[in-house]
Amino acid sequence: MAVYTDVAPAELEAFLSGYDIGTLTSFHGIAEGVENSNFLVQTTRGSYILTLYEKRVNRDDLPFFIGLMEHLAARGLSCPQPVAQRSGAVLSEIAGRPAAMVTFLPGVSVRRPTAEHCAELGRGLAQLHLAGADFAMRRANNLSVAGWRPLFVAADGQADDVAPGLADAIAAELATLEANWPQGLPAGVIHADLFPDNAFFLDEKLSGIIDFYFACTDFLAYDVAVCLNAWCFEPDGSYNVTKGRALLSGYEAVRPLSGAEKAALPRLARGAALRFLLTRLVDWLNVPEGALVRPKDPLEYLKKLRFHQAVDSAQDYGLAA
């Protein structure tokens, strides 16, 4: 989450008048994340999250995101539920941006996940995949393999300004993955951005999953690979196989991976690392002036990519033989 667009108190009060959720008592921007502008809104009825969809978000995708949250919540997954206005509309506009109000989930995100957190996360991810199996809408993953070269181009020759040799490293990996990306794996709704700041815990148990604005239709095992990258590396860049084993065991307790998915996991993990390396690189080079946002270090994902390049099989991630 982040804040790119400011909202004036009077604007927000007028916006809230279209909802049956009480009157405004306080609000503040949320700095975490990179994509949209988010505010924690307190009213006389409770707490809510207001999201303003920024220019990088395609308005045509918003019904997918909103519909998915409604679908998953209806199937028992703990995730934000869109709040309808009195008119029945879920999408509205404020400060010149499309906007939606969603329910606030209790719990806290963890900055240093334990193996127990990883096991909980694995189970929750598999439950999300099963709950989304009958979701009728589809959305292509525009940040999968076909979208990586345009991101590299968007870095506009500046990769080596971030680290010498980075451009060549990205170019080589991109060529390898474009030529060898897995095909025909089980697919469905994926979260695609399930980092620790998008999962909430209460008493060490997963209490909710948030921020579905990268969700799309893609290989389910790619979502697992994203989570291995996001949850199972230590601050020094080393892979924690105990956390990986916990995450994978938790996932497979709910939805066992197929043989093809297991075989593809190292390549999928490389792809996930390259995806976040590229998007972080572009964001690092293009932070809007005055935005309340913390750009994330792209080189963290270069280190992770180097690890994945040396992996022989899914067993190296902790997957049971």
UniProtKB/Swiss-Prot annotation:
InterPro entries: Aminoglycoside_PTrfase, Homoserine_kinase_II, Kinase-like_dom_sf, Pseudomonas-type_ThrB. Pathway: Amino-acid biosynthesis; L-threonine biosynthesis; L-threonine from L-aspartate: step 4/5. Its EC number is 2.7.1.39. GO terms for biological process: threonine biosynthetic process. One of its GO terms (molecular function) is ATP binding. It is an enzyme of class 2 (transferase). Keywords: Amino-acid biosynthesis, ATP-binding, Kinase, Nucleotide-binding, Threonine biosynthesis, Transferase. It catalyses: L-homoserine + ATP = O-phospho-L-homoserine + ADP + H(+). Belongs to the pseudomonas-type ThrB family. HAMAP family: Homoser_kinase_2 (MF_00301). NCBIfam families: PRK05231.1 (NF003558), thrB_alt (TIGR00938). This is Homoserine kinase.
